[in-house]
Amino acid sequence: MRFSAATVSALAMALTVAAAPGNTAKEALAKRTDDLTVADAQNICGKDLSVNCCNQVDASTNNNDNSGSGILSGILGGVLGNGGLKLTDGCSSIGVGIANDLLNSQCKQSVACCKTDGNTASGLVAVQLPCIPISGLL
C-alpha cells in the first residue's frame, strides 16, 4: 500500500484532535443547563410534568445492577445503564410566570421534572415516579 503525504498528514491531524483533552461530562452538562430558560425546561419535561427545584437526590435509586427479576428489569437496565435513575425529593414548583428567566437564576439546587398530580399512577405498567432530574433527560 502506498500512502501519500496528504493522507499521512490528515491521519496524524485526526489522531491529534481525537487525543486532545475535552470537557468532562459534568462540565458539558453544566453548560447545557446554564443556558436553559424555565420555558425550555418545561418543554423538556412535557405537558404531564412540571419544572421543580429539588433539595435532595435519592442516591438509593442511583444504582441499577440488573439483579431484579421481571420484564422491566432488563428493559430499564438496557436503557438506563449501570448509572441507574436518580430520583429527587423535597421539590417545589417553579412558576410558569417566569418563563423567560434563566433556569439557574431560579433554582440553585437540582432542577427536576415532577408529576403534577403525584397521587395517581395509571396505564399498562402503572409506574409512579416522583421527580426526575432534568439533567437525566438532556
UniProtKB/Swiss-Prot annotation:
The keyword Cell membrane does not apply. Disulfide bonds join C45-C113, C53-C107, C54-C91, C114-C131. It is found in: Secreted; Lipid droplet. Residues 1-19 form the signal peptide. InterPro entries: Hydrophobin, Hydrophobin_CS. Keywords: Conidiation, Disulfide bond, Lipid droplet, Secreted, Signal, Sporulation, Virulence. GO terms for cellular component: extracellular region; fungal-type cell wall. Pfam families: Hydrophobin. GO terms for molecular function: structural constituent of cell wall. Disruption phenotype: Leads to slightly enhanced mycelial growth, small conidia, slow spore germination and appressoria formation, cell wall integrity and virulence. Reduces the cellular lipids content in both mycelia and conidia. Interacts with the lipid droplet coating protein Cap20. Aerial growth, conidiation, and dispersal of filamentous fungi in the environment rely upon a capability of their secreting small amphipathic proteins called hydrophobins (HPBs) with low sequence identity. Class I can self-assemble into an outermost layer of rodlet bundles on aerial cell surfaces, conferring cellular hydrophobicity that supports fungal growth, development and dispersal; whereas Class II form highly ordered films at water-air interfaces through intermolecular interactions but contribute nothing to the rodlet structure. Belongs to the fungal hydrophobin family. This is Class I hydrophobin 1.
